[in-house]
């Protein structure tokens, strides 16, 4: 690869996170000749013994258009399959971006002897379960390292969401960085609309805007049909098509000393805003 061109690995906790947060940036990176891959980590189905908790039922009912008391284990696997299909359709709008989906289950599906770690929304946006920290996170880190034995990638991890899956991956990104991997972070949309603090020393935020890609980003987001109600409320498709709801801004966190990353990312937007 040309020394001026780089390979980027974007880490998406769930099927929609990178498209919502980074789609325009991905497209401009590809346009400039860089290589981009998206690795969706929590794309697996729950185990057959899993008994859905309150939050799993709530989300599945909302996504599938059912009542909560109708939700059974099979519905969860149906939902995961549908979300995977939506993700594949979304990335057809971004030709050239490589995509890989891992089989680690979403937080709301993780369990011990059939019982969920995270039963409520408060649990889901709280502190990661000790078993996730001690057992699950090291497995994720080991897999991520196996993807880059030649250390050719610049890794782009989620930064600011309080969702336990995002928190685990933020920690994984910091650990990879401590081992010498080049790492930067992105603020997850729509979470950054309420909270946008990356509590690490030596990092600065870069805001990118590139309106030329907005129509394609909008079309890609619209493919995530099961998620639109939960993300954007009633008449979400109309709001998106009318130019509302989505943000043109895409936010990244880059180490102050990473001159290569700053050079590449400042070139991606007509007027990048450093804060």
UniProtKB/Swiss-Prot annotation:
It comes from the Bacteria. Its cofactor is Zn(2+). Binds 1 zinc ion per subunit. It holds the Pfam family PIG-L. Zn(2+) binds at residues 14, 17, 166. Keywords: Antibiotic biosynthesis, Hydrolase, Metal-binding, Zinc. It is an enzyme of class 3 (hydrolase). GO terms for biological process: antibiotic biosynthetic process. InterPro entries: GlcNAc_PI_deacetylase-related, LmbE-like_dom_sf. Pathway: Antibiotic biosynthesis; butirosin biosynthesis. It catalyses: 2'-N-acetylparomamine + H2O = paromamine + acetate. Belongs to the PIGL family. Deacetylase involved in the biosynthesis of butirosin by mediating deacetylation of 2'-N-acetylparomamine. This is 2'-N-acetylparomamine deacetylase. It comes from Niallia circulans (Bacillus circulans). The lineage of its organism: Bacteria, Bacillati, Bacillota, Bacilli, Bacillales. The gene is btrD.
